Amino acid sequence: MSGHSKWATIKRKKAATDQKRGNLFTKLVREITIAAKTGGGDPGGNPRLRLAIDTAKMNSMPNDNIQRAIKKGTGELEGVTYDEITYEGYGPGGIAIIIETATDNRNRTVADVRHIINRNNGSLGENGSVSWMFQRKGRLEVPRDGVSEEQLMEVLLDAGLEDLDSEDDNCFSVITAVKDLEAAKKALDEAGIGYENAKMDMIPDTLVEPGIDDASKAIKLIEALENCDDVQAVYSNLELSEQVMNSLDS
């Protein structure tokens, strides 16, 4: 399994400084609503809802917003019905892309996604065309302050740890099986180790490193998709060469 991508590191840093809080809250509300609809409104018995609530709280979403989203999902309050649709395709340089959406209008969403991909030198594929290149995993980001790699290994060894990425200067990336993400969170809580950005992720088996021109176009495509209102998450197997990294820093 790969996924230790320089692009993934850049995305995490960009997300940490992203000021589009309204857009972020919209995506979080949709995830909470869908989670409550599919698994019930009790986070104690609904891991997906519990994770969505934790993420919302980490991003300072008011509790009233969270509770309204839950009630819309369970039907206690009237709300929009969302369908979850996943699209797959290719971007510049042959990178594979998975786009997860939540929509109340399938026709609008597929038209928007196709338009963005076509406009940015990509192509929309059939279901299954690229998903076989990825594995769904749990991921947590643990800030490096006050914790060592050895401490993390010791705390998480019996809590489902599959991989520990230490390439980021600011945080460790903890990778678990989907079913073990809650156990990893609990182990960190009990050890008094803080974490952030706990989520389900799609991790590529191998990474693709395009040339500088295609890499720049691929970044533009991914960012355009992430800014689409109906898109919840975008995953890719993009890797950036040192040359591309230097051009981004300049």
Curated annotation (Swiss-Prot):
Gene Ontology terms, MF aspect = DNA binding
Q: Which family does it belong to?
A: Belongs to the TACO1 family.
List GO BP terms, alphabetically. regulation of DNA-templated transcription
Indicate what this protein is called per its UniProt record.
Probable transcriptional regulatory protein Cphamn1_0542
Q: Which NCBIfam families match?
A: PRK00110.1 (NF001030), PRK12378.1 (NF009044), YebC/PmpR family DNA-binding transcriptional regulator (TIGR01033)
Q: Where in the cell is it found?
A: Cytoplasm
Which keywords accompany this UniProt record?
Answer: Cytoplasm, DNA-binding, Transcription, Transcription regulation
Main subcellular location: cytoplasm
Q: Which cysteines are joined by disulfide bonds?
A: none
Q: Which GO terms describe its cellular component?
A: cytosol
| Gene3D superfamilies with a match to the protein in the record | 1.10.10.200, 3.30.70.980
